[in-house]
Amino acid sequence: MRCFDGHCDTLARCMATGEGLRQNTGHVDLARCAALGQHAQIFAVFANSAAVNEPLYAIAQRQHALLERECARNADLVRRCRTARYVRAAWAAGKTAALLGIEGAELLDCNPRRLDDAAAWECVYVTLTWNHANALAGSHCDAPMQGLTAPGRDFVRALYAHRMLPDVSHLSEAAAWDVVRLGLGPVIASHANSRAVCAHTRNLSDDLFCAIRDSGGVVGLNLYTDFLGGDGMDAVVRHVEHLLDLGGDETLALGGDLDGCDTLGGGITGVQDYPTLYAALAARGYDSALLQALFSDNWLRVLPK
């Protein structure tokens, strides 16, 4: 099957455990990705700023270096990519496509000049905050009434100028709307669900989902049980059904938050179980064209060509 997952925290996990990407005990490794047939994975650079003692930018550099090193060591299985064309070329060569995202602009010191480095790393998107507010914006749980600051607006403009996407996952509702209202291009939520289905502040209101839809962006389905509101496949399907009912055929994608949470829903234990989700949705009558959009094509559409 063809599968494109837009968010995992496997790099941070590998840094913590000393494991590599070829095979490990987490949710994502290259061997399991290869078994899917055609897989693309956006690996997020991530650190909890409240729990580390070194400069965040240094952590970002080390995690980026880890990805490059692991891709070089495992060139039989994986190819580094940024554009849709290179993802398709990796698949044609029988390899997993590995892409890079950055979860939390604090990892770039909230400095638009650091985006030159992120662009050189072939970064696809930057999540503007994690759970802590920063110089750019409030988060969903820290300063939740704070929208984009003036530096935040400048940072978003610089993102688009560098052909990267702003990710509003973790942002306050006010800040997410500020990003949308700038009207500069597609807006994404790489790993978020429906607040109407599960009333968690990390999830998107219907109006915000529709605004992301209208921007031409994508929303990656998050498999963390706390954001699903249950641990069974029915909980996952409820979010899919609701977001598709909002006209999300070209918006809804995958963003499982693999290796970023302890408990995944739907009986999924890792990337190898995405076919289980595909089968569950097919059994509910969703046709192959729609499932291909959800499982791969919607992410491909928002990448640079």
Question: What is the predicted function of each stretch?
Answer:
Residues E241, D245-G248, T263, A282, ...:
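Hydrophobic alpha-helix feature that most strongly marks membrane-spanning transmembrane helices
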